[in-house]
Regions:
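Donor nucleotide-activated moiety binding/catalytic core segment of transferases
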Residues: 13-30, 141-142, 168, 195-242
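A donor-sugar binding/catalytic signature common to diverse glycosyltransferases
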Residues: 46, 219-266
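Gly/Ser/Thr-rich loops at beta-strand to alpha-helix junctions
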Residues: 40-47, 194-197, 241
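Conserved nucleotide-sugar donor-interacting segment of glycosyltransferase catalytic cores
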Residues: 21-76
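Conserved catalytic-core segment of nucleotide-activated headgroup transferases in glycan assembly
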Residues: 113-205
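Long, C-terminal catalytic modules of enzymes
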Residues: 143, 264, 268-358
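Conserved nucleotide-sugar donor-binding subdomain of glycosyltransferases
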Residues: 1-36, 109-126
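Active-site-proximal region of nucleotide-activated glycan assembly enzymes
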Residues: 52-128, 273, 280-285
């Protein structure tokens, strides 16, 4: 399901499972001399409950998120994402600010022209690549403000940051869709290009419920949306936030996100504020400074330290492939990679990263 149904009998099983994890984890940690715990995730009940109990007992907890080789959880930062609210303060202390911004500018411009960098290596194709339907119009061009909503995958961790205005992505969508008619805008929706297949049924149901809302093809190039003169972009915490802002587009976020320390996008703190800006787009006043976006980009994707090592942010970008379970040769290929010493530096890299966070 894309959101919680309090009448769903499966919810009871989830709660029982969570309680089982809680009491089992607590008993084990209280009766064994555990010093450190390594988790693949810091969210979802099978990981987050164990991690939080461990932290309450003074046990070190580590995760391996996308942005860092190693991330160390703390009681005041339980999520797997970097401490992005400190980005500005950290950057201010750097001596080569201009060089760092130059580095960001090159990579960011390459991304916006269709290249996939290591920061978005999870994308199968670039969302800014030119497509075969480039002559088709995105907006109706009816004189109304042009607004695009970028959907998230409904099943992909809506709570990886500290908080969000809505309980989940589905409630955000319902909130916006139910107000589109009153907004009186030229409105389009783009599904997430990497969304899980289960999203398709949800989207079809939304189309039936809101027949007047126009959905784009999920592979529509973001470049085309920008070129048609979009006035406002809606996202909860997506990378499109800083990418569209770099083109001077106003962006309305709906939750804590990596750009929260900066002022090039707008983040309301309540549903009431969010609704106000939806209904009054002309009241959104932003001073978008490209250098701020370049600074953010450097801190989020390129900066060394706090669990990130030299060589950018993805240690395992040695040989990018889709991990398809039907590919029976996948593990043989990994063994072949190891035989030519492609992974020899992995343990040294982890040691360096752990030293940084400890």
């Amino acid at each position: 399901e894309p959101t919680v149904d309090l009448e769903d009998k499966r919810l009871k099983n989830v709660l029982i499972n969570a309680l089982d994890i809680y009491f089992t984890s607590k008993e084990y940690l209280n009766n064994n001399n555990v010093k450190k715990i390594v988790l693949s995730h810091a969210v979802y009940i099978q990981y987050a409950i164990l991690g939080r109990i461990a932290l309450s007992l003074g046990i070190d907890v580590y995760t391996f998120p996308w942005e860092r080789v190693v991330h160390k959880l703390t009681s005041d930062h339980l999520v797997p994402t970097p401490r992005h609210l400190e980005y500005r303060e950290i950057f201010e202390k750097k001596s080569k600010k201009s060089d760092h911004k130059d580095q960001s500018r090159k990579i960011l411009n390459d991304r916006l022209n269709g290249q996939i960098d290591r920061g978005i290596a999870y994308m199968k194709t670039s969302p800014y690549a030119d497509t075969s339907d480039s002559n088709q119009k995105i907006f109706l061009n009816n004189g109304k403000p042009k607004v695009a909503l970028m959907m998230h995958c409904f099943y992909d961790a809506p709570h990886i940051y500290k908080d969000m205005i809505f309980e989940d992505f589905f409630e955000w969508i319902e909130f916006v869709f139910s107000r589109v008619e009153k907004m009186d805008v030229d409105f389009v929706v783009k599904p997430h290009p990497n969304a899980q297949p289960l999203n398709n049924e949800i989207i079809e149901n939304l189309k039936k419920k809101y027949p007047n809302i126009r959905f784009l093809n999920k592979n529509t190039s973001n470049k085309r949306i920008i070129l048609e003169g979009i006035d406002l972009l809606l996202t909860v915490y997506g990378t499109v936030g800083h990418e569209f802002a770099y083109h001077g587009v106003k962006v309305l976020m709906a939750g804590d996100n990596p750009t929260a320390a900066y002022n090039f996008s707008l983040l309301p703190s309540t549903k009431e504020q969010y609704e106000y800006y939806l209904m009054n787009i002309d009241k959104i006043e932003l001073t978008i400074n490209k250098e701020d976006i370049e600074e953010f980009f450097y801190m989020h994707y390129l900066d060394i330290g706090d669990g990130r090592i030299e060589g950018n942010n993805d240690l395992f970008f040695v040989r990018k492939r889709d991990y398809d379970p039907s590919n029976k040769n996948m593990f043989i290929e990994l063994i072949d990679d190891a035989s030519v010493k492609k992974f020899d530096s992995v343990f040294d890299s982890f040691s360096k990263a752990i030293e940084q966070v400890d």
